Amino acid sequence: MRRRNLLGAALAAPALLRSGIARANEPVDVELVLAVDVSRSVDPQEQEMQFSGYEAAFRDRRLIEGIMGGPVGAIACQMFTWSNWNIQNIVVPWTRLDSPATAHRFADAIAAAPRRTWLYTSISGAIDFAARQFGQGFEGTRKVVDISGDGVSNSGRPVEDAREEALAQGIVLNGLAVLDLTPLPPLLGSIQPPLDTYYLEEVIGGPGAFLVVAEGFSAFEAAVRRKIIREIAAAPPPGPIIERVA
């Protein structure tokens, strides 16, 4: 009987050991958070263009080659939508991407994600939420937040405060500003800064941070593909801090 008990304890020991020790985070080249604006200014058709653009990007051969081309040969990616200061929804959880199959499954998850529209635009809320997402099972040599939107922040705390806290954590903030080509009313146009200028001065930051400007939602797919390829590059190529896609 004693021998049987000892044998049982020996067999159980590895499981107990595994349960008692925290698993190390899995190494990846980049931890990338995709933060997608779903405020009221993004109408249903434009929102569909956003989701379709991200989906197409993760099916693109060049992007997949970039994912597999780093020292580790993998990235970790998560996607969430945002609007008001307190409204953020994870639509695709953290996923390791290391092959065409995993990238395509990520694209499938984007295609299946729910589409919702909310009221306000809180870029600071999006940054704060994104900053809390890192370190959840992965350890990247770079931590990057990809913020896409079509308007300035009008909800929550100052964007500058959220940005500075994120930068202090070693997070790089890149932007994808989608320009509304409809002329603003004269009064509003005089008090609201151009969106590309706003993102450049108030939103992006960190080593190698850059901004891609989509000239309308019709340019979103090409813009987001170009942006993510640049973000996941093993050694991000030097380039203009602002890049325009028409």
Predicted regions located by residue number:
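N-terminal export signals
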Residues: N5-R23
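Von Willebrand factor
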Residues: E26-V91, H104-K143, V145-S148, G175-L187, P194, ...
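Second-shell loop/turn segments in exported
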Residues: A35-Q45, I110-Y120, G149-S153, G189, ...
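Short beta-strand-loop
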Residues: G73-A109, P186-L200
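Exposed acidic/Ser/Thr-rich ligand/metal-binding surfaces
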Residues: Y120-Q169, A246
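VWA/integrin I-like adhesion module and closely mimicked acidic/polar interface patches used
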Residues: V152-Y198
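C-terminal "exit" segments of structured domains
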Residues: V212-A246
